[in-house]
Swiss-Prot record:
EC class: transferase
Underlying gene: cmoB
Name of this chain's protein: tRNA U34 carboxymethyltransferase
EC number: 2.5.1.-
Subunit record text: Homotetramer.
Key words, A-Z: Transferase, tRNA processing
Function: Catalyzes carboxymethyl transfer from carboxy-S-adenosyl-L-methionine (Cx-SAM) to 5-hydroxyuridine (ho5U) to form 5-carboxymethoxyuridine (cmo5U) at position 34 in tRNAs.
Statement: the UniProt record of this protein carries the keyword tRNA processing: yes
Pfam family, one: Methyltransf_9
Length: 328
């Protein structure tokens, strides 16, 4: 199974130590329910990776780990075949020992859009909710974050993350836990909390915003990115069934409605930093994700609409601060 003992050792010495009251039991229960099935086969793939100590780790401008010269051509081909077993790769891209993992999403584009708007991450404790395979977590570390924790219940994302971490000399300041936000206690320990591409999957968006708030220190920063529609503060789309072929889509507010929701939950200095149409250059099928992608989700005769007739995907980036309680 995945070994979480290094994470326990790390947080025992930092501001997350109080999490040890509940976390080991949670993850022990998770392990007991994931002994069989696809996870076991993915872990066998992880165990086949060569042990290589690399001196080349680039996280500031991209996620590039290891050099192509550290492996023979045969070893490179074998590693590429192993990495392909974690198909589909959704978020990236990654370069591992010269192997370019061309993921479905150009997550680096999103990072480039949001980076100018957020507070510097240097020395910060960061939580990434719904982190996927962890691409943005590596970029957070590249910006100098002291400790980065990602949570995502997907077994595949966990194994993809562990694959990258294996070649990053088993980095001990970036960790992914297979949990949902609803499984976290009120830690109140992170300087920055990211939630990107999660809110529209929640039946109760207000509860999600409050759960994010509970993880922040007072004065901490929320970075929230979600699908939005046009309109004023009263505009909210509730898809009848699917949206862009996606199940489990509940609420798509306007950017102004989103701002109002976050303010209503008690955040301060709430602002919409960016609104961006998702284009097929940013989300597309590749050799590392051969399933349908954005092009297949849009009306072929009108790309401004989804196949269901709703407005095409548009994403807003919201930044807010958790209020500091006044001294009594």
């Amino acid at each position: 199974m995945i070994d979480f003992t290094n994470f326990y050792s790390s947080i025992a010495k930092n501001r997350l130590s109080h999490w040890l009251r509940t976390l080991p039991m949670q993850l022990h229960e998770w392990e007991n329910t994931h002994v069989h099935g696809q996870l076991a086969s993915w872990i066998r793939v992880l165990n086949k990776f060569p042990d290589i100590k690399t001196s080349h780790i680039e996280l500031k401008d991209r996620v590039e780990i290891g050099s192509a010269t550290e492996l023979s051509p045969g070893e490179t081909k074998k590693l590429e075949n192993l990495l392909q077993k974690f198909h589909p790769w959704r978020k990236g891209p990654f370069v591992i020992h010269g192997i370019h993992i061309d993921t479905e999403w150009r997550s680096d584009w999103k990072w480039d859009r949001l980076l100018p708007h957020i507070s510097p991450l240097k020395y910060r404790y960061v939580l990434d909710v719904g982190c996927g395979s962890g691409y943005h977590m590596w970029r957070m570390r590249g910006e100098g974050a002291e400790f980065v924790v990602g949570i995502d219940p997907s077994e595949l994302f966990l194994c993809q993350f562990e694959a990258v971490r294996h070649f990053a000399n088993k980095e001990q300041n970036v960790h992914l836990l297979p949990l949902g936000i609803q499984e976290l206690p009120k830690l109140g320990a992170f300087d920055t909390v990211f939630s990107m591409g999660v809110l529209y999957h929640r039946k109760s968006p207000m509860d999600h915003i409050t759960q994010l708030q509970d993880q922040l220190v007072e004065g901490g920063e929320l970075v929230l990115e979600t699908l939005v529609i046009g309109g004023d503060e009263n505009a909210v789309l509730v898809p009848q069934d699917r949206y862009a072929k996606m199940r489990n889509i509940w609420f798509l507010p306007s950017a102004q409605a989103l701002k109002l929701w976050v303010e209503k939950c008690g955040f301060e200095n709430v602002r919409i930093a960016d609104i961006n149409d998702t284009l097929t250059g940013e989300q597309r099928s590749t050799a590392w994700m051969t399933n349908e992608s954005l092009e297949d989700y849009l009306d072929p005769n009108d790309p401004s609409r989804t196949v269901e007739g709703y407005p095409a995907p548009k994403r807003a980036l919201l930044i807010a601060k958790k209020a500091i309680k006044a001294l009594s």
